[in-house]
Curated annotation (Swiss-Prot):
GO molecular function: nucleotidyltransferase activity
Domain of life: Bacteria
Organism, scientific name: Campylobacter jejuni
SUPFAM superfamilies assigned to the protein according to its UniProt record, in alphabetical order: Nucleotidyltransferase
Record protein name field: Probable nucleotidyltransferase
Length: 264
């Protein structure tokens, strides 16, 4: 059962849990994703955040963090939570893929319950997605930062890292767009906005941008995806047009990558 809770109250609560566990090792909690970019839908979005620490954390602390999130799972949005714990030094001195201490998400809950050592261990871990998450955190939004201001913690992420972080997921949309049209349509739009105009946009705002900057023959497809994203509607989509849109978007993206000689 999901208990509806004001999202800002939940953010404050998450921060308090983390501070209590980390004590002097706490730097801050930084929310990213659709919430930071202004298109959060509690029925379709998860709560994304990065926990930053001064020093490495041991397995006992890792388990305390995971157990606290599970203990309060019912307070999170329907899609749950996704978080990573990262050393402050790895937020300032960025290398790609970015190392992390701990990861947690709804997709990892069952494996955590079955065998904690799969999730909690001393292995060296890296995540290419963190470059994209850090880039979103660099979009100013003081309401999303708890602890030290994000501008004092996170360095600017090189564009080639951000592109590499998103590129394979974007390519997958060619095959996945029929099964997951809303996500793929809007993700292709916002990634093209990033590649072409260096814009960091939410999925919804990526759709708005595409209505003015991409082939208008697909405006109805994009509008349907935007409507479905922010509401409980389920528009129907023509599979052939979906695939054509994906192929055209990928072609535009690749042209920009090649023109700017961006490593992918």
């Amino acid at each position: 059962m999901v208990v509806q809770m004001d999202i800002y109250d939940l953010m404050k609560q998450v921060n308090e849990w983390v501070k209590e566990i980390l004590q002097d090792n706490y730097v801050g909690v930084y929310f990213h994703g659709s919430l930071r970019l202004g298109s959060f839908n509690p029925n379709k979005s998860d709560l994304d955040f990065i926990i930053v620490v001064k020093e490495k954390i041991d397995n006992e602390i890792k388990q305390l963090i995971w157990d606290k999130m599970l203990e309060n799972e019912q307070l999170f949005p329907k899609k749950g939570f996704e978080f990573s714990v990262v050393l402050e030094d790895n937020c300032r001195n960025i290398k790609h893929p970015i190392p992390y201490e701990l990861h947690g998400s709804r997709d990892w809950i069952e494996r955590y319950k079955e065998d904690k050592t799969i999730v909690i261990n001393d292995d060296y871990k890296v995540d290419p997605d963190l470059a994209s998450h850090f880039n979103v955190i660099n979009v100013p939004n003081d309401k999303m930062d708890f602890g030290k201001p994000s501008k004092e913690v996170f360095s600017k992420v090189p564009k080639e890292y951000i592109i590499d972080s998103n590129y394979s997921d974007t390519l997958d949309c060619v095959e996945e767009i029929v099964n997951n049209p809303v996500y793929c349509i809007l993700n292709l739009c916002r990634f093209y906005a990033l590649i072409r105009d260096d814009l960091t946009l939410s999925k919804y705002d990526g759709g708005k941008w595409a209505l003015e900057n991409m082939n208008s023959n697909y405006n109805d497809v994009i509008k349907n995806a935007m409507e479905d994203y922010l509401s409980d509607t389920n528009n129907s989509y023509d599979n052939t047009r979906l695939k054509e849109f994906a192929q055209e978007a990928i072609s535009l993206i690749n042209d920009c990558v090649d023109t700017n000689k961006i490593r992918k």
